[in-house]
Amino acid sequence: MVKAVGIDLGTTYSCVAVWQNDRVEIIANDQGNRTTPSYVAFNDSERLIGDAAKNQVAMNPYNTVFDAKRLIGRKFEDAEVQADMKHWPFKVIDRSGKPAIQVEYRGEEKIFTPEEISSMVLIKMKETAEAYLGGTVSKAVVTVPAYFNDSQRQATKDAGAIAGLDVLRIINEPTAAAIAYGLDKKSEGEKNVLIFDLGGGTFDVSLLTIEEGIFEVKATAGDTHLGGEDFDNRLVNHFVQEFKRKNKKDLSSNARALRRLRTACERAKRTLSSAAQTSIEIDSLFDGIDFYTSITRARFEELCQDLFRSTMDPVEKVLRDSKIDKSSVNEIVLVGGSTRIPKIQKLVSDMFSGREPNRSINPDEAVAYGAAVQAAILTGDTSEATQDLLLLDVAPLSMGIETAGGIMTPLIKRNTTVPTKKSEVFSTYSDNQPGVLIQVFEGERAKTKDCNLLGKFDLSGIPPAPRGVPQIEVSFDVDANGILNVNAADKSTGKSNKITITNDKGRLSKEEIERMLAEAEKFKAEDEAAAATVQAKNGLESYAYSLKTTLSDNQDKFDSADHETLSKKVDEVISSLDTMQSASKEEFEGLQKELEAVANPIMTKFYGAQGGAPGGAPGGFPGAGGAGGAPAHEEGPSVEEVD
């Protein structure tokens, strides 16, 4: 049985891990990298995912999609979505109130939901794990930012379903990182641990109490729209202005130039974590102008000052909510690539009176590590290390219903341990009211208009009665994934109605998921067909060139007519290869057969002559046959295969 894996589906990079031989193994991808860019690219002939997609982004900016996590489970008119669209070269459109991504693939216009793009990244992670484990992977624990709301969690679960994964559990990233930190520290007594998780696109802070394998989250806070990408944006804007000052030209209209600049900025940002200054050199950036400049760490810190400082607010909120004071926090653990920034480390350290944060876990891999441990537990692993492990997580936001006057009445308060169930009795607002509309919201504000509507449903058929008499019991049930189910019942008639908050505006239906799953299979088949075509082309090319080498190395050993016939055919094939850019696998195979039909009799005659040539030692020219045949053997199909 192939194991369940843990997947950290990140904004900018993703990572997959598995529990095996009593420990976690982080699985490297086909490029040997332990994290994979969350990028998907489309072009005229194929779809690329991961490193291959990110590597070609400057050549194909409009059809390379990234940051899907910043769109998933959101509404098109969200302020963050609108702001992000200014930075993205790919086109985001409004599809019944939800954002969708429009690209050109194989010469056709295609529209994908953020769930589909995320599912493609998940498929890549699934395939990475399958290559390593040598079997089909169908079960996974997928992580989300702790501060993701209900719609974002549900959409992430849908992405898993489209990727053909049974998502055993959605767990919070900081909680997963806490497992990575605390797994081997079971016997150290009770500890209060603060996880500070700043990644490529999201930011979470969670405070946990860890004792004897029980990980209890006390409070969580964060910003689902703050991370390394935002620091890159500040650098990009800074250099666009500098380029404008120096050259009186605005490069922001050119997607390719912007992308090249962004890649350089990301590299510069990383360098500034270990160096005080770095230079940027981009040849022919825009209108043939080379852009050479430099930036200091101090300037970078100044450009991002407000963003860096804003990371302290959730830390304070978590301390307040958990009623634990700074001095009682035993460890501060940094997670996420952006915590490598020295200024961030200093702010965290200053916040806790100069205490050094704990750096014992890998900030890029900790989340996938914890997810893999949870996957092992959920599939019944009996290893001693995972035996007594218990996760108690919390709901990040209050959830409740709208009552008269647009008031938000929370049933489940934020930071309540999940799974949880809570019921309250409500009544009608006017006499003889036949039904009630139950509107479910999440958020911390007093008025529902300032909160996020999760969904609504009607409870009808209430018998006529004066206001305040009917008793309507509303129960909220939050499962272990942090996803909400709501039930309302009229106590006098026993009539009830319930919904899983599928955010009727935001959630994909079962049919849509099935359609997307079928499409994902189709894309996979297309990807495989494209790979087979490339293989057929490469096979033909290497066969033709190996024949060419044999012909030129042994010109005097061939019959002159044979030499001319075969040379002519080989040259003809090589020149047609240059023009066959969009040929099919069958065309390449047909051409190979044609070439073999001409080559085989001539090569058989040639090897026969080499083997039986008179004079000298037995076997004719020592090594001649071998030398002539070697290229064909090593590079293409061997000549002996076809009679």
Curated annotation (Swiss-Prot):
Database matches in InterPro entries: ATPase_NBD, Heat_shock_70_CS, HSP70_C_sf, HSP70_peptide-bd_sf, Hsp_70_fam
Annotated GO MF terms: ATP binding; ATP-dependent protein folding chaperone; transcription coregulator activity
Q: What happens when the gene is disrupted?
A: Sensitive to high temperature. Normal cellular melanin level. Increases SSA2 mRNA level. Mildly decreases virulence in a mouse intratracheal infection model.
Q: What keywords would UniProt list here?
A: ATP-binding, Nucleotide-binding, Nucleus, Stress response, Transcription, Transcription regulation
Gly residues biased stretches? 609-629
Q: Which SUPFAM superfamilies match?
A: Actin-like ATPase domain, Heat shock protein 70kD (HSP70), C-terminal subdomain, Heat shock protein 70kD (HSP70), peptide-binding domain
UniProt record, GO biological process: regulation of transcription by RNA polymerase II
Where's it mainly located?
Answer: nucleus
Induction field: Induced by high temperature.
Q: Where does the record place it?
A: Nucleus
Organism superkingdom: Eukaryota
Q: Which Pfam families match?
A: HSP70
Task: Give the CC-aspect GO terms.
Answer: nucleus
Q: Where is this region: Disordered?
A: 608-643
Q: Which family does it belong to?
A: Belongs to the heat shock protein 70 family.
Q: What does this protein do?
A: Transcriptional coregulator that functions together with transcription factor HSF1.
This protein's assembly is summarised as: Interacts with transcription factor HSF1 on chromatin.
- The protein depicted here goes by the name Transcriptional coregulator SSA1
- Which organism is this protein's natural source? Cryptococcus neoformans var. grubii serotype A (strain H99 / ATCC 208821 / CBS 10515 / FGSC 9487)
* Gene (UniProt): SSA1
